[in-house]
């Protein structure tokens, strides 16, 4: 065979080898990202259904560290081979072109070397890394099922080298007193999880309601009972000394609650709680008289807790005590309010409204763009989240309380501007602010 033909064949073989090395890089990159991204629960479902390749895929993702090492070895070997073979091959193809252009040998060598480096790098990054990575992230399940077996074969063939490299790395990290990192043992901060959830919502993986629930859970253990309580002045209570079942009937007609705290003398002495279901069942019996029966036989024990207790601890305590209501006390032992299980659950799922809440005004009522009617009991933290403001929570918990710290002579239509918003009192009962209108300051 003439020397020219040999050179052409050799160049063709070299180009083919370069293409194979780039494809191998793409293979290992795609497999690496797909086995990390794929959900183990989904693979378990496919194994149960007998899906082809599912068992191999499960084996790979349950031994993730070993197979990630195999992928990294494959990428490294392919990259070294590409550097060793790719640039000289492309450089050889370019040199005749520069010679024909009349360039001297030094300039020809320099230009062909630089261009060959750029071409090989471009092809390797685009075809060998970026494209496979994007494809693997979007089609993680399919790629894992398709390439799990080839990856297992590669791992078995290269096992001595992988074992040697892993143990060498462990020895080096051990010298510095470090434990070897495990790629699949990832821990995320709360903020990182919030970002991941937000991205999942934007991509359509989760619904808006699910995003809201998860974000509420993150703040759940930071909330104190006093932040969600029904304050003392709004508690509807029954007096053990004065109220009969007949009086109770009138109270229920007006307020429509299921449970009521029972007090002796005043609200600082809450002795129990009464459940209207028990009263109703008794009223259905023939010998029950509304006028004669007192409420004392129906009074059940109620728990008392400090108002600063975290709501997650309070929920656990209420579950343990099998009660739906807790009385909150302040540092001086006086009653500050009450909390029900419903109040706590609403911190996760949002406001729960039954058939008797039809006339109740929501805490947040949107009137227009950057224009709201807010319940004065709304927590300052919720107001800041809604408006993007920075109202101080140092002294008070609620929007109404904050307004009074800014204007102690608040009355209807009193207004202040703060942090780019106008806050105006729309409804007030004595010194108790009920609703505040908020809109973007002009």
From Swiss-Prot:
Keywords, sorted A to Z: CBS domain, Cell membrane, Membrane, Repeat, Transmembrane, Transmembrane helix
Domain CNNM transmembrane: residue ranges: 7-210
Membrane topology value: Multi-pass membrane protein
CBS domain segment(s): 229-290, 295-355
GO MF, any single term: flavin adenine dinucleotide binding
Stored CDD domains: CBS_pair_CorC_HlyC_assoc (cd04590)
Transmembrane domains' residue ranges: 16-36, 74-94, 110-130
InterPro entries the UniProt entry points to: CBS_dom (IPR000644), CBS_dom_sf (IPR046342), CNNM (IPR002550), FAD-bd_PCMH-like_sf (IPR036318), FAD-bd_PCMH_sub2 (IPR016169), Ion_transp-like_CBS (IPR044751), Transptr-assoc_dom (IPR005170), UPF0053_domain (IPR051676)
GO CC, alphabetical: plasma membrane
Pfam families: CBS, CNNM, CorC_HlyC
SUPFAM superfamilies linked to this entry: CBS-domain pair, FAD-binding/transporter-associated domain-like
Compartment(s): Cell membrane
Family indicated by similarity: Belongs to the UPF0053 family.
Protein name from the UniProt record: UPF0053 protein YqhB
Gene: yqhB
């Amino acid at each position: 065979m003439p020397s020219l033909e040999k050179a052409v064949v050799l160049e063709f073989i070299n180009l083919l080898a370069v293409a194979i090395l780039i494809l191998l890089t793409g293979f290992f990159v795609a497999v690496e990202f797909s086995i990390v991204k794929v959900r183990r629960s989904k693979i378990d479902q496919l194994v149960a259904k007998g899906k082809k390749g599912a068992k191999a895929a499960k084996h790979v993702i349950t031994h993730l560290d070993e197979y990630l090492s195999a992928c990294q070895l494959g990428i490294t070997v392919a990259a070294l081979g590409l550097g060793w073979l790719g640039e000289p091959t492309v450089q050889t193809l370019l040199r005749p072109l520069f010679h024909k252009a009349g360039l001297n040998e030094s300039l020809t060598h320099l230009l062909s070397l630089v261009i060959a480096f750029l071409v090989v790098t471009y092809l390797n990054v685009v075809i060998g890394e970026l494209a496979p990575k994007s494809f693997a992230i979007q089609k993680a399940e399919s790629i894992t099922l398709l390439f799990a077996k080839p990856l297992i074969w590669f791992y078995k063939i290269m096992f001595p080298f992988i074992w040697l490299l892993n143990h060498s790395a462990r020895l080096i990290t051990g010298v510095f007193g470090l434990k070897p990192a495990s790629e699949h043992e990832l821990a995320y901060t709360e903020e990182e999880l919030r970002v991941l959830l937000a991205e999942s919502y934007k991509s359509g993986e989760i619904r808006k309601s699910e995003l809201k629930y998860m974000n509420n859970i993150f703040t759940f253990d930071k909330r104190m009972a006093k932040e969600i309580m029904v304050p003392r002045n709004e508690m509807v209570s029954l007096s053990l000394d004065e109220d009969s079942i007949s009086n109770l009937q009138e109270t229920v007609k007006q307020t429509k609650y299921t449970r009521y705290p029972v007090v002796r003398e005043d609200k600082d002495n809450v002795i129990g709680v009464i459940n209207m279901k028990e009263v109703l069942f008794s009223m259905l019996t023939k010998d029950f008289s509304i006028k004669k029966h007192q409420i004392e036989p129906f009074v059940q024990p109620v728990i008392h807790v400090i108002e600063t207790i975290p709501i997650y601890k309070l929920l656990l305590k209420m579950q343990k005590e099998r009660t739906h209501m807790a009385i909150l006390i302040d540092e001086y032992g006086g009653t500050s309010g009450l909390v029900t299980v419903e109040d706590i659950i609403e911190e996760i799922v949002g406001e729960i409204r039954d058939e008797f809440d039809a006339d109740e005004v929501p805490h947040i009522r949107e009137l227009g763009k950057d224009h709201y009617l807010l319940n004065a009991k709304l927590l300052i933290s919720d107001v800041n989240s809604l408006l993007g403001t920075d109202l101080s929570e140092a002294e008070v918990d609620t929007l109404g309380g904050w307004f009074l710290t800014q204007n102690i002579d608040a009355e209807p239509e009193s207004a202040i501007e703060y942090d780019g918003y106008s806050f105006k009192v729309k409804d007030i009962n004595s010194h108790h602010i009920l609703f505040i209108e908020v809109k973007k300051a002009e």
